[in-house]
Amino acid sequence: MSFDVASLRAQFPILSERPGGRPIHYLDNAATAQTPQSVIDTVSRHEATSRGNIFRGIHRLAEMATEAYQNARGDVARYLGVADPDEIVFTGGTTAGINLLAHAYGDTLNHGDEILLSDLEHHSNIVPWQMLRERSGIVLRWLPVTDEGRLDLDALARQIGPRTRLIALSHVSNVTGAETDVGRVVEAARPVGARVMLDGAQRAPHGPLDLPALGVDFYVFSGHKVYGPNGIGALWGRREWLEALPPFLGGGHMIHRVARERSSYADIPHRFEAGTMPIAQAVGMAAALRWSMALDWKEATAHTQRLTERLLHGIASIDGTRIVGPLGLQGRIGVVSFDMPGLHPHDICQILDGHGVALRGGHHCCQILMDRFDLAGTTRASIAPYNDDADIDACIDGLKDAVRRLR
Amino acid sequence: MNDDLYHERLVALARAADNAGVVSPPALSGEADNPLCGDRVRMTLRVKDGRIAALAHKTRGCLLCEAAAAAIGRRAPGSGIEDVHSIAARLRDWLKNGTDLPAGTWPELADFAPVRAVKSRHDCVLLPFDALIQALKEVDPR
């Protein structure tokens, strides 16, 4: 049976909106994915029936909110394939998760210890480590990127040494769509005792994960990219590692006991969840992950791969256009960046907006990668399972119109 | 909205790229970056007796940014520093606050009228002017 994209689209109310009198062809999913009605209903129902502060309230609403929040933690654990929900720390998103690690894990590092990043990282997986370098004198090393927009894993042996403490890489590039061969990274990390953190912002939206099988130590992702609300995300860490880390933010809830002289801290995950957390957002993100877990990802992936191929062929048919990333479907997702010489990405996006097509243009918070390809920016189309042939065709038609009008 | 934005005169202005390049030293220079998109404009110029004697721009930007840089390249040489400051301020007000563009400003600026409705693109037009003002700070640090 073929993938029923029409019934999937019907679950996303925004896709039937007509802003400016045109249908929406939403291909900016790598920035923010749309959210299904079930998630909107869950958040609305929670706020209407179960709103209260969590953990310390001795009343029915507080208990209901606490239960919903803790159940959400369990749903995140299931989505990531991990058995222990206490290994899930709710965060404000991927950036907040990496900053948490840069402080907490960073506090365990010494002057001269090394962290390996890559040239294709999002700024959120670069700047927090640069700030740590300024605070504590750690050394950053860099994996290069191949002409195809993939991590050059052949360089791992050169970049990893006895002082390497952490390897922090994108699971999937938000520019090139290339998926990292995590097995090779983990294999290279283990002999020197380095930990591996994956920025899963772009991979997490494309189906449930099995983190124990991946063999990594930390994983971060964002709720708004997995069809859930803004302002929420999660950090997963192996229990033994999270337990060994000091807290990052101080405040209510993250303590065991507070006294004038010193304070002691709560067990994981609460140690890392200071203050009142975004409760409804956590509940909403869990609803989004349950929605995702109910999807047939084998069919959904076949569908998005077919659309990706259609998009790649369409872009390649436009004279002079260059794909920044893998040209084929192997080891990539439907995040497709391209350069059209003489046309600026923002002008392209503006023209495409006139066709009802939502794209993203610019450096995508990856200026080091842009330098690698000698570009100021690219135009990016990114695909979700609810996209269809009409979205891709509108995009290609719009790109041809942009060439006609701007070149 | 988009149909209006990239009209023929504006595209032609951007492609004309008047005075693209670099003024040979000795020159004043100013640079402006848009961190949202990575666009960058560098203005180099010479000033004599309170007027811009020579000016050139290196522009890595979108069509709106290129067109604004070309307008500067076409009209700023020969203009007084005071006039340039005034035009930049009036352009900013016209784009962002809906004021009128007074008679006597550079005629090319009226071609940016459709941009007023697209807030996210105002800074594309203003970036070359920011670089120009930056360059002039060396002689007029207002």
Q: What feature does the model see in each segment?
A:
Chain B
Residues 1-21, 79-142:
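C-terminal binding/interaction regions
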Residues 28, 41, 57, 69, ...:
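Short capping/connector residues at structural and topological boundaries
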Residues 68-80:
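Alpha-helical support elements that line or immediately flank enzyme active sites
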Residues 37, 62, 124:
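Functionally engaged cysteine thiol sites
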Residues 59-66:
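Short, thiol/selenol-centered motifs that function as redox-active sites or metal-ligating centers
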Residues 16-59:
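Structured beta-strand/loop patches that form or line metal/cofactor-binding pockets in enzymes
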